Amino acid sequence: VAFLYPKSPDTSDWIYAHDLGRNYLEETFPDQMKTICVNDVTEERTEQVLNDVIRQGADIIFEVAPQMMKDSLKVAVDHPDVKILNCSLNTSHKYIRTYYARMYEAKFLSGMIAGALAENDRIAYIADYPIYGMIANINAFALGASFTNPRARIYLAWSTSENYDRERFLKDNNIQVVSDQDMITPRDPGRQFGLYECSKDGRKLNLVMPLWNWGVFYEKMIQSILAGSYQSEENSEGRALNYWWGMSAGVIDLICSKNVPTGVKRLVDHLKSDIKKGDIVPFYGEIRAQDGTLKNKKDKAMKPEAIMEMDWLTDNVIGEIPTMGELRAEAVSYTHLRAHETL
């Protein structure tokens, strides 16, 4: 099983999470498979690297970035016996399956905690790439915050924008409660991850960490392949497949620290259980965009396609989706493949 990474696990929390999943896979199937990983795979090198790992014997390949999709299609057609899966949302192709996780479920719960703890009703959300899935995360967080605090306002910043300065952004907007990158990286094991609170003396008080359990997803995929059900899915459907799993499948979770008040944690645990059972969905009821447009009707659950393809922000978000020209050069190629039409 080969894993293709656009960066290295040391420098990216996204890649680090996937690499933890790869290690979990090796521990789960020690006698049935082995894994290899290739770091720093650029869009231009994708086809070459794919052919290299196939020559090394890889018959299952996980690509963890959407920009690899385009140059993978030729390889997938040339090697129909090799299973190639790309980690992206809404980019399915009949020759390549895609997979992603419903992180917005955890963000909704994280937003609830943020709303309950933001004394001045101001909360920061620091996003990275404006791709499919990210906008749903932001909006779910904003809806969660309004669930516990109707006055809450979400101040949005993009860490990949040219003029990004976290500390200045927080100071200028008088913000203490912050939703930042999802987890630490080995090279930068700081406290600025997940949901945290900035104290007046400058300390960071960690509250919540959303968790991508990629190991669980990869385990389920390998089990499906070993059992023969992966191929039967393909034969019976005859169309592109996009795996989009969440808390109910164990692929997404939320870890609360002891710094979260007991009453708030009890509420979050209860709602997390309801989300797992399907009794509660974050995108339900009347939802309006920043311009007042009605995006979801009362007593209705939003359709999955509408969640995947969001290119708008809820009416309690202050900020906007950046244009390509506002992103740093290294972020443009990552964003380009599945950028929103507003970019």
What do these predicted regions represent?
Residues 1-21, 25-29, 36-43, 66, ...:
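Extracytoplasmic "Venus flytrap"
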Residues 34-53, 159-171:
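Structural motif
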Residues 58-66, 85-87, 175-184, 208-212, ...:
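Periplasmic-binding protein-like
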Residues 77-100:
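Flexible loop/hinge segments that line or gate small-molecule binding clefts
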Residues 99-121, 211-231:
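Hydrophobic alpha-helical segments within soluble ligand-binding/sensing domains
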Residues 185-266:
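Extracellular/periplasmic periplasmic-binding protein-like sensory domains
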Residues 335-342:
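Conserved small/polar residues in nucleotide/adenosyl-binding loops
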